[in-house]
Amino acid sequence: MSSISLIQPDRDLFSWPQYWAACFGPAPFLPMSREEMDQLGWDSCDIILVTGDAYVDHPSFGMAICGRMLEAQGFRVGIIAQPDWSSKDDFMRLGKPNLFFGVTAGNMDSMINRYTADRRLRHDDAYTPDNVAGKRPDRATLVYTQRCKEAWKDVPVILGGIEASLRRTAHYDYWSDTVRRSVLVDSKADMLMFGNGERPLVEVAHRLAMGEPISEIRDVRNTAIIVKEALPGWSGVDSTRLDTPGKIDPIPHPYGEDLPCADNKPVAPKKQEAKAVTVQPPRPKPWEKTYVLLPSFEKVKGDKVLYAHASRILHHETNPGCARALMQKHGDRYVWINPPAIPLSTEEMDSVFALPYKRVPHPAYGNARIPAYEMIRFSVNIMRGCFGGCSFCSITEHEGRIIQSRSEDSIINEIEAIRDTVPGFTGVISDLGGPTANMYMLRCKSPRAEQTCRRLSCVYPDICPHMDTNHEPTINLYRRARDLKGIKKILIASGVRYDIAVEDPRYIKELATHHVGGYLKIAPEHTEEGPLSKMMKPGMGSYDRFKELFDTYSKQAGKEQYLIPYFISAHPGTRDEDMVNLALWLKKHRFRLDQVQNFYPSPLANSTTMYYTGKNPLAKIGYKSEDVFVPKGDKQRRLHKALLRYHDPANWPLIRQALEAMGKKHLIGSRRDCLVPAPTIEEMREARRQNRNTRPALTKHTPMATQRQTPATAKKASSTQSRPVNAGAKKRPKAAVGR
């Protein structure tokens, strides 16, 4: 079978004729002020990108890629980074754009960037100079769009970035604990681009430059728009109800129009005329020009089962080879979501990463440190996408399931550029990876299966037989990279997908021998089948095989190296017993985790659907379908997090209380098989003191005098009330009997 993919774009990313402004040439940095525009000889910007991150001219930052990509097409692109959103003034600093505003919250969702998994305010921001918090608003996409519209009403606004991408439909919002409308509806933007934006961004920019109104640009893949009805020429499937999909369009009469009755008159035969032979076009695929009507925003907000149903449909329409468009009603309008864009080819990826990035922050930041840049300045991104399909992760929804890899030459050229141009380079490449370290050049071996598959994961519950697990391209890349002059070491900091790695032990040997700096990160996430099945993660058997091979090859190389496993607490499907078993596993293997992560319900993830609805969208949805146990509430989430840090004395009282309630008091003590030690005498006394000082809960029936009492006066009042009512009164003489 041919190895050429059947998923091909209509045209190459760089095949568009350049816009006339290409005569200005590339800018040293995309301008952030009028002074820089004057130095470049620009009277205006064609496109202005507004971002919630600091502007770092590096291919790991989305706005740098989008800006340089548009610049290569001939457009003059300006950047407004982390503007003051209190007024429209900062959004007008570069003047009025000729074509459109591009708005993004940044590399991270602004709410995740601002709040912890426990909804507590963060006091830092890695994407801001000097790690200062508070430089971007909550729901930055909405705020920035409103200010752009306030500044220039007639300029189109196009949303992008991960915040907008994961909010393209009605979605559960963890921070307000409610279902919100599509961000496209709330923001009143003109268009939304989801996922990797190069292909739709270039097409829309050129079509706007040719004078086409944005209201008429409706057929671009990877975009979402607002419509009043379905696009003409599309047929629909109604999935607004559970498991009863059906055609929306009326079924045509099988015999055509009714014929008149025969009048029995003789009819002369018609003369047959010669016709030219014509080639009939191929029959359309069943998914072409087809859309799925999802349950409306109003329906999914009021019915959790319909929400889970809509989520399940959305996740099955993500393969660019066979995905159908989606349509969801919001009030009297519809959000129309076109199918995903065709992935970039290796040649296109090479061209994107070969754009003239400076690989440093904009000079306007001076000597300020940007932690996110410090982390990646010596790293190289070798691929995009992930076919793991983890339920809690948004990478697959954002970057796609098909791996988009760069060529070996392109990666080597970037390593040499880092060596020769980046200040402070010491000869160590901090990472050679991507969303996953070991998916480089891995793809489906069957082009037809790749085009039509709707599986959520290529590796769960088992690795698909069509999936190529040959790590030879990755091994060859590692060897060539570490042989470069001036390169002392190549480290792998991206997470290794160990269930794929065990299929090719050569990769594990190469990794353990040359590319681990003492510790290697992997993410089993849990040890128990209940939560693992909801996460779509492999069991511990794959972990054990990987650890055995890793330890063997490390020993052969004469190195003492360790695995650092990552785990998630409070994930849907996790019961208290599961967390206790995980804690016992950690203690048995002598792991003491410093940083632990509670499950964070981010928009669009399957795990978030489980968290909100209590249903499992990985299986058929119905009102009587499988219910998923969800650990909610601060107390239970704190307990699950505490069990991951069983060794911390601050967590012992909470763990003891939970173990006693679960009937597992035998796990409290000093024996080796115990999880936490028994309380000391001083701890028991302190617990009694705390219980003694507690006050009963107040209700509407509590007397006002008691409500206003302090603990001291309450104690005095209680001692007074314990005496007889007439204790202090003088005794009256008894009445004479028989008077």
Curated annotation (Swiss-Prot):
Keywords on record: 4Fe-4S, Iron, Iron-sulfur, Metal-binding, S-adenosyl-L-methionine
Cofactor binding summary note: Binds 1 [4Fe-4S] cluster. The cluster is coordinated with 3 cysteines and an exchangeable S-adenosyl-L-methionine.
Tree of life domain: Bacteria
Region (Disordered): 685-739
Polar residues biased stretches: 704-724
Record-listed [4Fe-4S] cluster binding positions: 386, 390, 393
Single GO MF descriptor: 4 iron, 4 sulfur cluster binding
Cofactor(s) this protein cannot do without: [4Fe-4S] cluster
PROSITE patterns xrefs: RADICAL_SAM
Transmembrane segments: none
Biased composition regions of type Basic residues, renumbered to the chain: 729-739
Classification via InterPro entries: Elp3/MiaA/NifB-like_rSAM (IPR006638), Methylthiotransferase_CS (IPR020612), rSAM (IPR007197), rSAM_horseshoe (IPR023404), UPF0313 (IPR022946), UPF0313_C (IPR024560), UPF0313_N (IPR013704)
Occurrences of domain Radical SAM core (ranges): 372-650
PANTHER family xrefs: UPF0313 PROTEIN YGIQ
Family indicated by similarity: Belongs to the UPF0313 family.
Name of the protein this chain belongs to: UPF0313 protein YgiQ
Source organism of this protein record: Escherichia coli (strain K12)
Gene designation per UniProt: ygiQ
